[in-house]
């Protein structure tokens, strides 16, 4: 039938569209995290930080601040600004956005809330640029400095999407703070 002819390859097209849209969404959210006035020139508004997840040992995750929150966040009450967000890929669960507002009374005690951005993200990888060697390296985890004291912020984030037999790699360039007028 005509429906079968036109429907061939639907899964792959829908999966690819979903993967591209999640990648673009994440790029936009990270871009809003580096806009003035919340991000100042020379600051690192996107950085690796230790996050306490559900009373477990803290994990070092890529973390950023969304001054106005995000449309994906489902608040128990009125939405709050200054939302600290972290990204984590979990086996069988996908890409998780961990978030809570700095204005919450138990910000330091309570673990962050969780929202699934995409169930099809099978992993995160981090791209680092070595200016001395003029080369890129892709790491499966956030990289430590040579002395091991700090965790380095990558220049790019790779999203590894997987659905059935389909694979897609989304690349998000991590923006840096820029000088300019605040967004009104």
Per-segment meaning from a language model:
Residues 14, 30-61:
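Short, glycine/small-hydrophobic-rich surface segments
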Residues 46-60, 89-91, 143-155:
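Short, surface-exposed loop and linker segments with low hydrophobicity and enrichment for Pro/Ser/Thr
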Residues 52-137:
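Type IV pilin-like appendage domain
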Residues 6-10, 37, 132, 170:
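Secondary-structure transition/capping residues
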Residues 118-184:
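Short linear sequence signals and composition-biased patches located at protein termini or domain-edge surfaces
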């Amino acid at each position: 039938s005509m429906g079968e002819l036109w429907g061939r390859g639907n899964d792959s097209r829908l999966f690819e569209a979903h993967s591209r849209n999640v990648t673009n969404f994440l790029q936009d959210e990270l871009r809003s995290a580096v806009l003035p006035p919340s991000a100042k020139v020379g600051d690192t508004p996107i950085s690796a930080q230790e996050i306490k997840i559900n009373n477990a040992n803290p994990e070092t995750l890529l973390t950023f601040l969304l001054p106005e929150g995000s449309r994906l966040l489902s608040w128990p009450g009125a939405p709050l600004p200054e939302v600290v967000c972290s990204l984590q890929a979990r086996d069988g669960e996908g890409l998780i956005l961990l978030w809570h507002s700095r204005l919450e009374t138990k910000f330091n005690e309570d673990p962050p809330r969780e929202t699934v951005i995409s169930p099809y993200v099978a992993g995160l990888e981090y791209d680092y640029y070595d200016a001395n060697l003029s080369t890129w390296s892709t790491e499966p985890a956030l990289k430590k400095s040579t002395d091991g004291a700090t965790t380095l912020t990558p220049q790019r984030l790779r999203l590894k999407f997987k659905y059935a037999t389909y694979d897609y790699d989304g690349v998000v360039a991590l923006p840096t703070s820029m000088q300019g007028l605040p967004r009104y």
